[in-house]
A protein has these predicted regions:
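N-terminal helix-turn-helix DNA-binding module of bacterial transcription factors
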Residues: 1-58, 333
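N-terminal helix-turn-helix/winged-helix DNA-binding helices
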Residues: 1-3, 41-79, 87-90, 98-99, ...
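Short beta-strand segments enriched in small/hydrophobic residues
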Residues: 15-19, 54-70, 170, 178-185
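Hinge/beta->alpha junction and helix N-cap segments in small-molecule ligand-binding domains
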Residues: 49, 66-76, 94-103, 146, ...
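Central regulatory/effector-binding core of bacterial HTH transcription factors
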Residues: 83-132
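Flexible loop/hinge segments that line or gate small-molecule binding clefts
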Residues: 99, 118-166, 187, 247, ...
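Short acidic capping loops at alpha-helix termini that bridge into adjacent secondary structure
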Residues: 177-178, 209-213, 262-268
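Flexible loop/turn connectors
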Residues: 229-240, 244-334
């Protein structure tokens, strides 16, 4: 297979000149263009991204760092980012951070060293200071699901605290007073904020509950099962549950049924995210909508705009969560 060096040798020009011709640079003279095109045709040479990038200084790559691409939540984020990238003739390079400092650091540095035109970063383990350092090196780096002081105009986030507060307030309005919280065991700000929202709503309603009503688990179905089992083992008079996400809610529903109880007749359950599973489990899950697709689109558009102009085209919003009513909550007044 012919290389750009082969083309340059046959055409009698430099590799840089071949790159200029490939990128249709006005700096390429007519004679050089004819020689290079003839050599490319003779060698059946197909320009690759690396050759184009030599002159354009653009890799046509958007880097995206997520927690774990196998998680449906992050799968939705990647898909939405890819749709925007495709519209701009770009491709994605994806890294996994797993909510671990070293993995997030390695992932960000891989994307930066790969000469990505822009980056959308979902990082929870690294400090604000370290992320500000990376952002200073790359003006087209945008952060999603996090607000970093000093970089607010490059952050696309959701009000997690408000979302959990909405869920708990809804249960309180339905007459529930003994509301358990299934929190994530991951030490990230999402967990802290959602737990704070739960406590905010209880405090506003004058509802005092001991910490025994809070159980933590991995933010997956199995974690929801473990946390719900821990709550039930205490024989607390729980009538409702606020879960960290829809998968923990699904695990909780499984344990409720396994213990001879029924949802929502005995225990109401609310999730968070409005992921696909919320629409298909039984009962269909009342939840908080997390517009991750819209947020990822906004973040990618912002990152690409910064890459092309280095100026802020718009101030990204902090998205407001929305309560989605389905069938997993029952009023205590009925």
């Amino acid at each position: 297979m012919a290389t750009i060096k082969d083309v340059a040798k046959l055409a009698g020009v430099s590799v840089a000149t071949v790159s200029r011709v490939i990128n249709q640079s006005p700096k390429a003279g007519a004679e050089s263009v004819r020689a290079v095109q003839a050599a490319m045709k003779e060698l059946a040479y197909r320009p690759n991204a690396a050759a184009r990038a030599l002159v354009s200084q653009s890799s046509d790559i958007v880097g995206v760092l997520v927690g774990d691409v196998s998680d449906p939540f992050f799968g939705s984020l990647v898909k939405a980012a890819d749709e925007v990238a495709h519209q701009h003739g770009k491709h994605l390079l994806i890294g996994n951070g797993y909510h671990r400092q070293e993995d997030e650091r390695r992932g960000i540095e891989l994307l930066m060293n790969s000469r990505c035109d822009a980056c959308v970063i979902h990082a929870k383990a690294l400090s604000d200071e370290e992320l500000r350092g990376y952002a200073a090196e790359m003006p087209s780096m945008v952060f999603i699901n996090r607000i970093i002081p000093g970089l607010e105009n490059r952050c696309v986030a959701l009000d997690n605290r408000r979302g959990s507060q909405l869920a708990t307030q809804y249960l309180l309005k339905q007459g529930h007073r003994h509301i358990a919280c299934l929190s994530s065991s991951h030490t990230i700000e999402d967990s802290t904020q959602r737990l704070a929202g739960y406590r905010d709503a209880l405090a506003e309603a004058g509802c005092e509950l001991p910490d025994a009503y809070i159980a933590a688990g991995e933010p997956v179905a199995e974690g929801g099962e473990a946390a719900m089992s821990a709550i039930l083992s205490l024989s607390l008079p729980v009538t409702a549950v606020v879960a960290y996400n829809d998968f923990m809610a699904a695990g909780a529903l499984s344990v409720i049924e396994a213990n001879g109880l029924h949802a929502p007749e005995d225990i109401s359950v609310i999730g968070f995210d409005d992921s696909m599973i919320a629409r298909y489990i039984q009962p269909r899950l009342t939840t908080i909508r997390y517009p991750v697709d819209m947020m990822a689109q906004t973040a990618t558009q912002l990152a690409l705009a910064l890459a092309s102009s280095q100026t802020l085209p718009f101030c990204p919003p902090c998205y407001t969560p929305v309560l989605v009513l389905r069938h997993s909550v029952m009023s205590r007044f009925s």
